[in-house]
């Protein structure tokens, strides 16, 4: 389907995509990510539907730590859930990020990368916040401009759903989050066509339900803990191919050339 052209910033682009693939958004505002949460809240209040035909349930928490806990709980209940944050707010989410990754929950965090406070606070952009999350087990996907945010944000959601590995999708705070560009916008019908509904249904079936109770969050001794941690490696090994697969589907729809690695140079180069 031909895409419409609209003028918007990076926050709007990420919010547009995340609304399509989310059933719950647990939010707490922090500059420069706040417009994403605000837009999603406005759209839900106006009755806008996601690709599943429902409104996104938006819940503002008392802090970013609470938002992360709500994301974790919502995912465990079988609802596709996202949040939006940056800087110190992202650091408050790290404890829950370890849990989400360890439990193979398809969380997607949209982050406007921003400097961490040191001797003083700074609202301007670097990537010290997202780099502090590399060890959590979240896959990380980055975009460099507003059109890329629109085009590639679906990859984070689609790969998380099918691959069961949570994603941190980020772009530069202010430089991209607040830059207004005229871009091609996804139609929700196109976004719906790319989602693996079998994976969505399997995720929902794994949700906590009193009709088929299960035990989570138990204690394990080192020998069993080690084996269960190793068992998750196959999901991480599959992530690059999944990302490439969904980039290919996006390329087929919109004529782009997104790949994990793009070569630029002489076609006959030998060194």
Residue ranges and their predicted role:
Residues 123-173, 185, 197:
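Conserved thiamine diphosphate
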Residues 52, 56, 167-263:
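Conformationally flexible catalytic loops at phosphate/diphosphate-handling active centers
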Residues 1-132, 137, 154, 173-174:
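Thiamine diphosphate
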Residues 35, 148-151, 241, 245:
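Generic recognition of stable, solvent-exposed alpha-helical segments in well-folded globular domains
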Residues 268:
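RNase H-like, metal-dependent nuclease domains and their acidic two-metal-ion catalytic environment used
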Residues 4, 8, 26, 61, ...:
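Hydrophobic alpha-helical scaffolding
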